[in-house]
């Protein structure tokens, strides 16, 4: 390995000695020039001045300013050279100064000294207003620490000591010395960074070294140390094995691979010199010495002053134009691509111009590899258009990105040997290198990128546009029509991923496809599938979802979900299960959806999921409740909708809007993040319909329960099923005058009062008058089901409320009164008797109900209530005791828990039997 990557070698010591000797010679030469220029200036001062002492003082002052002013100019020049806002006029002046300095270095130094003299004279003239006389400069200031650093006559009497101190602190260097030190400094920085495996710094410093080397050419010949460095760096990079590359982190790994390609490309133009160096290293290094390196003719640096060991660089980095797009050839494509990627993320980047240039490059590309590289870059730039703006991607750009993704898939179909992968160990910028590397990879040419990432971004931008467009305008409908083309692209991309066999990416794409179909009716799913498959040739088919099975939506959803169950990560499996349950509930398969939800145990872990998954879980629970309602299961509907409908934040829990806080307001960032979680309007569940279903089921359950509680003094029957319904009903009861109902809530409250009074026909009229039922499929069947439920619950309410006033009642009479079959009345009465809700006996011979007189006095009622409260208090105390002692003896705790549970169960049974006997 070369000496550049070995620490503490003798060659580096020799170089440092040469550098110090070179600096000494340079400083002595410049000092002589300063003395000659100072003599000329002193002669001019003697002719213009009348006093010898004044001329000598001015001469010393000019010498001091001549050293200080170039220092300030060098520092300013270094700052201007590093900034990007330098004007064109200053560049022209710098170039003219550099040309004059190359032709005659001593003349440029004398000119700079004359300029510094003029500046010092202007400073003296500006200070004349503060001086009291011609010899006032001989007076010392009151505070020495306030002396200006550039005035020697204010330093005191020991002028020799101050001059010696300044010579130790300041060194005047020429441009070639600066370039030499900068050249060596870059190589040392690269050497140190390589020893610490910091390849990001190596990559950055390598670009800097190339720029400096262009300024250090020896009469058209490259510097020998630079050729030696390139040879050593190339050997270092080529000797790295795959194990070493894998040991690097992601950022350094990418930097290493990029540097390897750039070094390989850069060494092509120096290949002849590198070959000559490797044949005879000593002979190659003899002809040139670094201390004789002249400055380049085109661009030149500026002399600088090194103060306290801190150097400022005045070399302006050369700028390379890329030319006009009309002059681009296919050989220049990769150079343009690299320039475009380097400009990404900068504020001054014109993305529209980049898109125009890439579109031009796509027409110039002649091979599939070139087209693919340009298309990938063009997609990345298109997605950067609205970055940070908070707006959705323009629709024309979205359609263009969709077309380009189809073009990429066309390239894959035409050339199966070209694949796009997310991680490439060694990406080649040139097509010849890519083809050569493919020979070691079974002939497969790999391009870095991700089709799935592009599809996910395209899908996200489509969703964002639907979130921001007003859903009540034709623009929303027009935008929604693009979903068919997006779904077609998802199906086609699935075929490509199945062909290359990337399971993880396939699972991500399957999840996107499932998100587009799980909430839709069967007719819409079938139509989307037909449109998608019609655009493919007959030979196109899929493995996961074959063409023959996609005509049935149930089989399609099942196939997609099963694949995610077997191959997806935990989050994808959870979302797939929720989508599957949602679809089953949408198809009115309540028991299957309920069993899948219970067997998956999602309710135990969904609180730890992300917000989008929690919203999907809430939507699934609501859909299960609506499915139960469509099947006539009132109690199951009420239980499924209870948790969401009683929170008061239904819109937020379902991802259909944001509820403003009562106190304060959202911050802009919080408001933006919350809006991203809102689902598109066509995916919303009608909240008015949801409230109507919940209140109707609450009415059918609460009214009989309230009737049972009013007929007995026992507190056990006074439990509240739906607190929101109770509060609404109590509010209506407090009204002195109640007008005709106007909205859904008022219709249900009026129907509840009629049902409580036993007027089931009037209750049925109010429920049927609600217009929201027309939004449900098979609205007539829903109304018929509600009529039957109202009659049954009216019968239960009648028996529970008026059982105390009857000795017996005929089943035929009840069937006629409530318009129910006798068999149905018998079933309802038997259920009431089995649950001990009424104390009676059923006489099937005569078809009548025989009621028993069971009157509990006040003392017995209070006794039963006290016993129940005592049992509850005892149970609470036992639980508290178990929590305190659960870590002492687990076996004893389990035994005590088991025994205590059995004991409490027996006590409750005994108390219940005793109360029944009374």
Curated annotation (Swiss-Prot):
GO cellular component assignments: cytosol; eukaryotic 43S preinitiation complex; eukaryotic 48S preinitiation complex; eukaryotic translation initiation factor 3 complex; eukaryotic translation initiation factor 3 complex, eIF3e; eukaryotic translation initiation factor 3 complex, eIF3m
Subunit structure: Component of the eukaryotic translation initiation factor 3 (eIF-3) complex. The eIF-3 complex appears to include tif32/eif3a, SPAC25G10.08/eif3b, tif33/eif3c, SPBC4C3.07/eif3f, tif35/eif3g and sum1/eif3i. This set of common subunits may also associate exclusively with either moe1/eif3d and int6/eif3e, or with SPAC821.05/eif3h and SPAC1751.03/eif3m. The eIF-3 complex may also include SPAC3A12.13c/eif3j.
Residues bearing the modification Phosphothreonine: 667
Matches recorded under InterPro entries: EIF3C (IPR027516), EIF3C_N_dom (IPR008905), PCI_dom (IPR000717), WH-like_DNA-bd_sf (IPR036388), WH_DNA-bd_sf (IPR036390)
Function summary: Component of the eukaryotic translation initiation factor 3 (eIF-3) complex, which is involved in protein synthesis of a specialized repertoire of mRNAs and, together with other initiation factors, stimulates binding of mRNA and methionyl-tRNAi to the 40S ribosome. The eIF-3 complex specifically targets and initiates translation of a subset of mRNAs involved in cell proliferation.
Stretch list, region Disordered: 1-174, 879-918
Name of the gene encoding the protein in the UniProt record: nip1
Domain (PCI): residue spans on this chain: 681-856
Phosphoprotein is among the record's keywords: yes
Chief localization: cytoplasm
Compositionally biased intervals (Basic and acidic residues): 907-918
Gene Ontology molecular-function annotations: RNA binding; translation initiation factor activity; translation initiation factor binding
One BP term from GO: translational initiation
Protein name: Eukaryotic translation initiation factor 3 subunit C
Compartments reported by the entry: Cytoplasm
Family: Belongs to the eIF-3 subunit C family.
UniProt KW keywords: Cytoplasm, Initiation factor, Phosphoprotein, Protein biosynthesis
